[in-house]
A protein has these predicted regions:
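Cytosolic, long alpha-helical scaffolding segments
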Residues: 1-244
Length: 244
């Protein structure tokens, strides 16, 4: 191999590494914004903070823009550098992760919109506790899986993947609790229905965190997870919420 050829290979490798570093930085930035969006959306619900709910909604275009930036950068990198094997999986994986983060952000935005819509409605504080607990679990899972993505930690990613059933079970329990409150006092019906949709949004966030775990597995192992994803029993969900 000539010195010129070696120099070109080294230059290409360095350029690809630079591209990957930029992609990784943008994914991390997007992950941080989405984590904040989840926390703020639930806090807005707990505190009846319409202004915070509006800020959650206003953050969504920034997250969408980052998702497009990562996708464009990955496509350009693939076209320019023509990566193979693990390098190609890095680009494909980043696009997948950002797609799931964007969807999580959408679900947080939905909660923000419900906070704004509820405003001065009858708002029993005790009904929100289950949503708080569920969101704390999903937020912890998202943080764990993003750390797993950053460090390519397969075991940590699999722990999140296996934890999806816990989120589903918590959602079912919360639905049953809210149905009980609705039967006890008709004044609770409107607010409980809003909370059911919020809970379903949070459950969907957990599904997307599990998708990210599957992406980490694909990036590390070079193949998809073949086992069936653990899922809780959702037969008690009202049909309208399931279709959301």
């Amino acid at each position: 191999m000539t010195d010129i050829t070696t120099t070109r290979i080294d230059h290409t490798a360095k350029a690809f590494d630079t591209d990957l570093q930029e992609i990784t930085r943008k994914v991390a930035e997007m992950g941080g914004l989405v984590e904040r969006q989840i926390a703020d959306s639930v806090q807005a619900l707990v505190d009846r903070d319409v202004e915070l709910g509006e800020r959650v909604i206003a953050l969504d275009p920034t997250i969408d823009a980052l998702q497009r930036e990562v996708e464009d950068k990955c496509i350009l990198t693939i076209a320019r550098r023509q990566p193979m094997a693990v390098d190609l999986r890095e680009c494909v994986g980043a696009m997948r992760v950002c797609n799931d983060l964007e969807r999580i952000g959408d679900h947080a935005k939905h909660i923000g919109k419900r906070v704004v819509a509820l405003d001065d409605d009858f708002y029993p504080q005790k009904l929100i506790r289950g949503v708080e607990h569920m969101s704390a679990l999903v937020l912890a899972q998202l943080k764990q899986v993003l750390d797993a993505y950053a460090s390519r930690d397969l075991q940590s990613a699999l722990a999140v993947w296996n934890g999806d059933e816990q989120v589903d079970s918590m959602c079912v329990s919360l639905f049953r609790e809210l149905l009980t409150y609705m039967m006890e006092d008709p004044r609770n019906i409107t607010f409980c229905m809003h909370l059911m949709f919020c809970a379903k949004d949070i459950e969907r966030m957990g599904d997307h965190a599990t998708n990210i775990a599957e992406t980490v597995y694909y990036m590390v192992e070079g193949r998809p997870i073949t086992d069936q994803r653990p899922k809780g029993d959702t037969t008690s969900f009202p049909a309208g919420v399931l279709q959301k």
